[in-house]
Amino acid sequence: MSVVLGDALGPRGRRRATVASVAATAVLLAFVALALQRLSAKGQLDAAKWSILVKPQVIRFLLGGLVNTLRAAGVAMIPAMVVGTVLALGRISFNVLARLLAGAYVQFFRSVPLFVLIIFMYYGLPKLGVDLSPYWAVVAGLSVYNAAIFGEIFRAGILSLDRGQTEAALSVGLQRWQAMRLVVLPQAYRRMIPTILSQSVTLLKDTSLGVAVTYEELLRRGQIAGEFGKNPLQAYVAVALVYLVVNMALSRVARRLEVRQRRRYQAGSISVAGAEETVAVAVGASIGGGGA
């Protein structure tokens, strides 16, 4: 059943929409032209200002920042997903204390700005006797914050599965934790892959907050290059383009996976029969592991 949010536009409405689109485009182009004119008047479009960005040493310097960005994001992903899984299980647990603790963690760390967490990790923890380098301060902040986000993503994935998945697993003799580990979690992870990748893109962009603690990720390296060459605008444009390319690539992968997942579900690949087959495989693996 589809929901119609508004009537279809008639000929007059379509003409008005076309005129509005053309007018908005014209205004945007005018702003762009004005900005370029101002930049040109101040010499910001001179070739000499941009030529420094193609120098090998500058390129290597910026690529080093990109490596640092990817390294911090990749390392932070691991504890974030592990703790996120624990939080998801805690949120759906029959144990009241586990639900309360997991819920409190999620609510607290989703409410605190990530910038504040990174600042606390670098400047606050030393007051408690824990000294972290800029790199580990960024990783720690990203990890504790994104654990709460991934916890909600995984919980949504678990709750989106048919209850028959767990019931079928329990009916053939698996313990509840075995059913969750062998049957439910693998399917929940697969179902939420597009969302996981989308959050990974956000995590990658959030590494730029490391500039506040002098971590030399891509943005910080761009800032240094701009100050050294006295062309900060050009350096920031180069950094923005690198972020754009990386994030567009990850977003494209996420969209493709989302389309593939949607087609699988529409084709009925996830069904009760599929659940029974999954449980049978899981039980076989469990028995085989126990025999070994």
Per-range role (PLM):
Residues 1-292:
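Transmembrane alpha-helices and adjacent helix-loop boundaries
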